[in-house]
Every structure is written in structure tokens, then in C-alpha cells.
Design a protein with these regions (language model features):
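Glycine-rich beta-strand-centered segment in the early N-terminal region that forms part
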Residues: 21-38, 48-87
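C-terminal hydrophobic helical "lid"/dimerization subdomain
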Residues: 248-292
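Mid-domain Rossmann-like dinucleotide-binding core that forms the NAD(H)/NADP(H) cofactor-binding site
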Residues: 121-191
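Glycine-rich cofactor phosphate-binding loops and adjacent beta1-alpha1 units
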Residues: 168, 178-237
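Short glycine/proline-centered loop/turn elements that form peptide/ligand docking sites
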Residues: 70-74, 81, 169-179, 209
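NAD(P)H dinucleotide-binding glycine-rich loop of Rossmann-like/cofactor-binding domains
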Residues: 84-144
Length: 292
């Protein structure tokens, strides 16, 4: 089978598509033929930085595909599934034509989406769910999401609105303002200087931007960026954890028409270097999908 691997850390040129042995499906595991995956910030960071499992390593966290062998009573051959694999910690990369994962990581794919769209949901959606859970938001609270046009930020806007939270967004470019409004945000701006002072009960920071002046005293602050936390009492990082339960809840919202995903570009796996270049250039409003 083909897989996307790195032998050294570096730029997009470090990515290699090569033949590797097919994985075996053991007891309690499910073997999935990959239809699509996506690019996430952790993927280019793992490629570029000296982090992650021993090399050579297969990259990728998101998975959408079809079961081709099962050592689990929960999944049968032919089932459409999605999953998130914590590649950095486990070494189980999903950028491969066949992926074997523990059964507890998989959930049935949304019925209302093609698998190439469903691939956008696992890491970004799980990250948003778990970060918002940390904030313990109440109906009527006012939330600011930074990086609201990104995959995580855009899903967070929608999820918070579903919970009855008033959501505003900070984006990096003027052209991203209207798309974020369409996701349900109230006020959206690309200028930090436009943010009202001491107006938000909570901040979900996906972009590493200093917006502490906009937070009420004692407000909640959760970040998934690589930047250091601001000097705010109780400020916390949120590190995503594998959770089929969270993923199943997201699937339910998608199939109910209450949560939508966004795709910016599709690339065949043979163009993975180009996909990385486009992703790192920024400015996209939606996910970059890899097709297998």
C-alpha cells in the first residue's frame, strides 16, 4: 500500500509517498481502506519540527474510509467510518491507503456527507468540543473565538451557538468576515483594535492572539495555539484527546443539519507536497483534503 512518510524533518520536500507493508488487523482492531484525510497544523509541525514518533513515520490524524476487515463485533466489512488517531503520541498515522486502528477510536461516518467531506470532522471537531467543554459556558454567555475562520474556530462558533452562547469572531483577513458570520457569529472583525474591552465571558483562542483586554475580569480563557498563555487567572491549554464519543456527538449534529463542514481544496495524495505548501501559505476558509 501507499503511505505518506518522512525520513527527516524539514519542508514539504521531506514528504515521501512510498510503498509500505499492509497493516494487519488484530483482535479488537478495525482495518480501514482510506478514502480521505485532511491537513491539520499538527501535520506540518510534525513534518518540520523534531517532534513525534521515531522516523520513518507515517503522518496524519484524520481518517474517513470503509472497513475492509474487522476484529471487532462493533464494525463490519463495508461500514463507512471516521476516526482521529493521535499520531504524534502513538505513531499511528492515517495518511496511508490502509489503516488499522483500535475499535474504540472509530465511529460511523455521517450519513449526510460524502467521506471526502466527513474526513474534515475528526481532529478539528474533537478539538473544538473538548476546548469548549473546558470553558463550561452557560446559555447567554458571550464568547470570543479567535481564528474563527479556521477549521477548529469555525466549528467552535457553530457548536457554541448550538448551546445558546452569543459568539463573536476574530479573523485574520477581511474576506473571512462574512463566511464566519454565515456560521452564526454575531460581530466579526479582522482587527484586534475593534474588539470591545471587558466584554466577553470567555475566550477560545485558536490563533495565538492577545485579546485579554476584551475578557471580563474572572472570565474563562482556553487556548489551543502554540503561543504561551497570557497572564490571566485560570487560563488553560486544551490538548485534544482521542474520543469516539465526542466524534459521535459531532456526527449526530451534522446529520441533523445543525453543524456544517467546509472544504477549501482537494488534492490527490500524490500532490501532498503541494497540499502542504497551500496549507502553510494560509488564507484558506476551509479544510485541505487529501484523497487516497
Amino acid at each position: 500500500m501507499r503511505a505518506v512518510q518522512i525520513d527527516v524533518h524539514g519542508g514539504p520536500e521531506a514528504l515521501v509517498v512510498r510503498e509500505v507493508p499492509d497493516p494487519q488487523c488484530g483482535e479488537g482492531q478495525v482495518l480501514v481502506r482510506t478514502v480521505a484525510s485532511t491537513l491539520n497544523p499538527v501535520d506540518w509541525k510534525t513534518r518540520a519540527w523534531d517532534v513525534g514518533p521515531a522516523l520513518p513515520a507515517t503522518l496524519g490524524w484524520d481518517l474517513a474510509g470503509v472497513v475492509v476487515a474487522s476484529g471487532s463485533p462493533e464494525f463490519a466489512v463495508g461500514d463507512r467510518v471516521i476516526a482521529m488517531s493521535a499520531q504524534v503520541a502513538t505513531g499511528r498515522g492515517t495518511w496511508a491507503e490502509l489503516v488499522a486502528l483500535p475499535e474504540h477510536l472509530l465511529t460511523p461516518a455521517p450519513k449526510s456527507l460524502a467521506l471526502v467531506e466527513a474526513a474534515t470532522l475528526p481532529l478539528a471537531g474533537t478539538t473544538a468540543v473538548q476546548a469548549l467543554d473546558k470553558l463550561r459556558l452557560q446559555r447567554g454567555d458571550r464568547l470570543l473565538v479567535t481564528g474563527a475562520a479556521g477549521a477548529v474556530g469555525g466549528l467552535a462558533v457553530q457548536l457554541a451557538r448550538q448551546a445558546g452562547v452569543e459568539v463573536d469572531g476574530l479573523v485574520s483577513r477581511p474576506e473571512h468576515v462574512e463566511p464566519v458570520r454565515e456560521l452564526g457569529a454575531g460581530t466579526v472583525t479582522h482587527l484586534v483594535s475593534d474588539l470591545p474591552e471587558r466584554a466577553y465571558d470567555a475566550v477560545f483562542d485558536t490563533a495565538g492572539v492577545d485579546v485579554t483586554a476584551a475578557l471580563v475580569e474572572g472570565g474563562g480563557y482556553v487556548s489551543v495555539s502554540d503561543e504561551p498563555l497570557p497572564d490571566v487567572p485560570g487560563a488553560a491549554k486544551s490538548y485534544v484527546q482521542e474520543s469516539a464519543k465526542d466524534l459521535a456527538a459531532l456526527v449526530e449534529l451534522v446529520d441533523a443539519g445543525r453543524l456544517r463542514v467546509r472544504v477549501a481544496e482537494y488534492h490527490p495524495v500524490s500532490e501532498v507536497r503541494t497540499a502542504h505548501e497551500r496549507f502553510e501559505a494560509g488564507g484558506l476558509s476551509g479544510k485541505v483534503v487529501l484523497l487516497f
